[in-house]
């Protein structure tokens, strides 16, 4: 993230503060504070995971500057093509085996829906086939998995094809989730017990969408379907 932590290790300033860029403690004795918020890290939950003292913003830890203004809302994709679309445009490294198991069950329960993924390396047919097979093993049909290559700065446009986004866990989305909400697409998140697993919690709470915050994988599945 270009944070130049070796500089901070030399403590050039009497008080040093970290914010954003890295969703966890720096581990540096000379870093005195880390900016977070009361929803991402409620008092008493994560102090033991941080070498810094936590400065909790009263609402949300971040600001968001969209890359472009969205086109006028043209209706839900499901109403246009008759098929409900789940989507995830996070780094695919976040889509761990437990996430695939969870999403596979969601697709098993919604056989007419599809999952749209944006994956670096999607030009490799063997890699794409491997991803599809993982979801099939988890209960989905191969035809329910649509995989696109990374779209760089045009990623937000893909949300026009999505009805509901799925937040991975335990490493959930940050900017990707902000893009989703900006484009009018809500997402389901699983609340964890660390900052990196609760970014979705604070973003949904601060946009009035608490009903999309799940406390268990079973609840996550139920909210999605």
Listing of model-derived features with the role each one plays in the protein:
Residues 10-72, 76:
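Active-site-proximal region of nucleotide-activated glycan assembly enzymes
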């Amino acid at each position: 993230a270009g944070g130049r932590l070796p500089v901070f290790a030399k403590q050039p300033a009497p008080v040093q503060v970290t914010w954003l860029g890295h969703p966890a403690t720096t581990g540096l004795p000379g870093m005195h504070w880390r900016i977070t918020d009361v929803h991402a890290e409620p008092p008493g939950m994560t102090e033991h995971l941080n070498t810094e003292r936590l400065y909790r913003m009263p609402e949300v830890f971040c600001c968001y500057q969209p890359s472009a203004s969205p086109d006028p809302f043209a209706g839900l994709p499901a109403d246009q093509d008759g098929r409900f679309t789940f989507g995830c445009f996070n780094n695919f490294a976040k889509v761990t085996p437990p996430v695939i198991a969870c999403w596979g069950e969601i697709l098993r329960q919604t056989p007419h829906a599809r999952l749209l993924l944006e994956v670096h390396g999607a030009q490799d047919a063997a890699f794409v086939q491997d991803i599809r097979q993982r979801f099939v093993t988890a209960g989905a049909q191969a035809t329910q998995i649509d995989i696109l290559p990374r779209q760089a700065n045009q990623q937000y446009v893909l949300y026009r094809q999505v009805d509901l986004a799925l937040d991975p866990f335990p490493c959930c989305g940050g900017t990707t989730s902000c893009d989703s909400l900006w484009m009018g697409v809500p997402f389901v998140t699983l609340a964890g017990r660390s900052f990196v697993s609760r970014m979705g919690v604070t973003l949904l709470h601060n946009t009035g969408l608490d009903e999309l915050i799940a406390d268990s994988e079973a609840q996550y599945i139920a909210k999605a379907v």
